[in-house]
């Protein structure tokens, strides 16, 4: 049996399994760390959350988000470590 959670992402409720939740939570924690010194960090995080929500909604309403889904979206959006490489 796999644990699932209901999460609120950009005002949308999603059913997400435990592995996906941990992956997504880690990703957003790394974003918060990366943007910690930015004046508009909260807005940046909200925009990224909104994009994740859009991509998850495209998969359907009665859908459980899996780690494969979060990995796919993270790969599309990029990791904060990659942001540094792009700005170098």
Residue ranges and their predicted role:
Residues 1-88:
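Soluble N-terminal domains of membrane-associated systems
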